[in-house]
């Protein structure tokens, strides 16, 4: 693999400052180039060069191609790298353009490298659980989707998930265990759905040792993959027949793709204005609170993920597929994993990463609980966002979006471990009585006290009659009492192109756009619903659909 570098966006710019500069809806070609820090020859020249791209009338013979290759891949994350590997191993020459100057792999390099899967070859060996199937996995995920997204793609991702984990192991990745996803009772889960599918290796994660490092090493072994860092793609190019023939970079140069283009960039993660325009309510809530200083350490996301891919896809007439789901957790890890009784079910201890839910309840600004707060964390964070909007959240006043943990002295050590104390954190408050917390929350003291009393009665009975919570049924009864604001940490949205099980991107006419494929979060709306499906779902889909896109684009005959 060869590396190059062209001018691109500088890392390290503050997110809020960057967002002000990076609202790309309706941006001209010149504007896109300037925002990226690239240098077209002139504004008028850049506009003239790129006008045919948007109308689909570009003549390849009239273009001065700086790059000529078989396959262009936009984005170096897991989806893009999997596509590059498959295309290169099929004999295609590949160029990967990465917007960031320094970080290869995007969000995939920052995540824990979990994969969510069923039926991989070592599942029984490392978990003690036998007989899991992709079909059982698919049935649960389809229920969780609630009919949203592409049902065929969700099912197919689950059916291929075990193969995807095995492929990663063949590539050099190792796994040490797997955790079950906490069930979501409102989506029809039962104890039979508590299966260890979230596979991990906590001794090898991140950019240097984990999932992305494994893929990067394999890509580097292939001489027909070229990586261009700091090269922002600004436009997708189509010819007069409507086929994709390449891309234009933000510096005004052009890259020919003789076989096709794979869009594998992120979604609108850190673009607040675009999130508002697209109605991505959970992301708007998360970005607003994060922008107000309620940061959630440990929930990384690339500042350069600002919706470029969505803008480019709209330019060429791609159909969009957007879901409310956001890969988002908070600094306390609400909805954390426990073994959910699996040791008892199997009659032996199982190798499960246990980070079980905390001794706290979640309440809104009325002082009332609103969800099953021990469910899978993607579901819980979605419910927090929904509760915030229902209570009158407006982005102009972040405090209107506050959701609160309520706990007592028994639960305090866990929060202290996370750095949340009244002395060190201005969103943590303590009082000698539950009534005293109401002033900080801004609710009726009687309502809050009644809710805590009701919760305590559920703990005594061993049954949460309101929402079915089962983990950490601990009463809130030992003073001092605490409340703490939830700090949402957005890590990735799922708004982008509509696609199919061949990883082809669909146009507004309902047909695949010739020679255009997608993988990663830019096609994540197809495999998502109202809430994120849990640790490893994104990475599994990047592997499944990245490989599919790479194989299929490499199999095409060149257009010249």
From Swiss-Prot:
Belongs to the FAD-dependent oxidoreductase 2 family. It is a peripheral membrane protein. It catalyses: digoxin + 2 Fe(II)-[cytochrome c] + 3 H(+) = dihydrodigoxin + 2 Fe(III)-[cytochrome c]; digitoxin + 2 Fe(II)-[cytochrome c] + 3 H(+) = dihydrodigitoxin + 2 Fe(III)-[cytochrome c]; digoxigenin + 2 Fe(II)-[cytochrome c] + 3 H(+) = dihydrodigoxigenin + 2 Fe(III)-[cytochrome c]; ouabain + 2 Fe(II)-[cytochrome c] + 3 H(+) = dihydroouabain + 2 Fe(III)-[cytochrome c]. Disulfide bonds: none annotated. Changing residue 187 to A: Decrease in catalytic activity. Still binds a [4Fe-4S] cluster. It comes from Eggerthella lenta (strain ATCC 25559 / DSM 2243 / CCUG 17323 / JCM 9979 / KCTC 3265 / NCTC 11813 / VPI 0255 / 1899 B) (Eubacterium lentum). This is Digoxin reductase. Its main location: membrane. Gene3D superfamilies: FAD/NAD(P)-binding domain (3.50.50.60), Succinate dehydrogenase/fumarate reductase flavoprotein, catalytic domain (3.90.700.10). Its EC number is 1.3.2.-.
